[in-house]
Amino acid sequence: MNSCTLAVKVVPGASRNELCGWMGEAVKIKLSAPPVEGRANEALIEFLAEKLDRPRRAVTLVRGAAARQKWLRIDGLSLGEVKSLLGTHG
């Protein structure tokens, strides 16, 4: 089974959840959830699972739980497939 690690730059507390594009090798995502008690992390996992059409359990936070720069493991997709699904402007 394929899996990859995705770098994400998170902006919590935004007015809405939004994919903002690529910043080098990281994708920038704005989330409406606040960075309190793991809410932004949960919102990020749910947002990416929906965008990538994967079950929630296929998206796992592996690094950066308390930081804005995060790394997530995506099971079942290669990095190329993830980039294609999220948009290739990066």
Q: What residue ranges belong to the model's regions?
A:
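Contiguous, often N-terminal, cationic amphipathic patches that form binding interfaces
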Residues: M1-E46, D53-R56, T60-A66, K70-G90
